[in-house]
Amino acid sequence: MALSQIKAVVFDAVGTTLMPEPGIPAAYAVAGQQFGSQLTLAEIRDRFDRAFARQEAIDAAAGQVTSEQRERERWETIVTEVFAEVASPDLFTLLWDYFADPAAWRTFDDVADCWRQLEQQGYRLCVASNFDSRLASVCRGLPPL
């Protein structure tokens, strides 16, 4: 395919275009402390990694089928596993809402310049992701997305 035939460039969201700021363990620590958690960042990171991997395995076994309901359930399970001692629906909601806020994210340093150059060359730019519906509000609040 010739470059002149390319009309759009599609970017993945998390890990390619944007990332949580502060990182997930730090955000989880702040939220967890509000509910009495005394976990260290290392403990949170370890528990998160294990819980996330378990959910990834479940999704892989199901053929990667997802939905808004499944995404909410998977994240609620992850939060519950990380904060087993203090887990509550309110803690989950706090974190769910936190990661829907553009202020909890930042674009990588090279994104704005890259997107500007591509737009100047006439390409349409898109973000495609398996992130749930919260991504739309995050992108709306993060220039240049």
Where are the model-predicted features located?
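Substrate-recognition "cap/lid" segment bordering the active-site pocket of phosphatases
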Residues: 105-106, 126-128, 132-145
